[in-house]
Every structure is written in structure tokens, then in C-alpha cells.
Amino acid sequence: MSEPLRLFLSEEVARGIRAHGAESYPNEACGAMLGVDGERREVRALFPLVNRRDDSPRNRFAVTAEDVRAAERAGAEQGLELIGWYHSHPDHPARPSDFDREHAWPWYSYVIVAVGEGKPREMYSWRLADDRSHYLPEELPAEVSAPPAG
């Protein structure tokens, strides 16, 4: 049996994802996750992006090729690499949609935070299977996946 997939991130990084989701509500927030992928995959910095989706920003997000290049440059300047993406699901669970799966790439981590009525809720991470047929759950530290207290 293979080891479960894991993504490590600090409470500070988790707060950043949740804050971006709350600030962007009722639209989806999105951003890049910069970090390392060696002995363990760890997010060390966020690179918030503007949701460039004009037609349905409440339930979709889009980034441009220039956004991707900017995130990669920012990571390189810090000795980090682009290891994944985060986005919010306003008034929906933190589970990937079919649209998310159709527009995702294998290897990357995808963190989704649910934002209900403007308040961040649970947060989960996923990786797309190599055959693109489904997502594989990726464990987050327990202290960051649960909804924030209060």
C-alpha cells in the first residue's frame, strides 16, 4: 500500500488562503502556492492572483499564462517552485468540481477552501490522478483543515 499524499503548510499560510477567500467573496479567490517538493511537499509562500474570469467569477476562476510566469518568477526569487494552486468555493463545499478536474494538471496540489456567507470554513487539498480521471485526497495538517474557531 502506498503512502498517503500529504501537503504541509503552516497555520500562517492557511490563514492567508482563508483571508483571500473571505476578501474575494462572493467571487472565487485564486492564487499560486510556492514551496518545495523533496522529502515532503511543503507550501512556504502564497502568490495571490486576480480571478480573471469575467463571465462567472462566483463559481469559476481563471488565470493567464502571464500569471503563471509571474508566480514562477516570484518562487524562483525565493528559491521556491510552483507546487500548486488554491481557490475558494463560495457557498459550496471544499470539494473539486468536474470543471476543476477538467482544468487541472496532474502533479500540482490543489487546495480548496469553502467560504460560506463570507466566512472561511473547511479546507482540503487534492491532486489530480495521472490519468486525469479523478482527484486523490491530499492530507493537510489537522490544525489547518478544520474550520477556524469562532
Could you describe each region identified by the protein language model?
Residues 1-82, 90-150:
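Conserved beta-strand-loop surface patch within small alpha/beta domains used
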Residues 85:
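Conserved, mostly hydrophobic/aromatic
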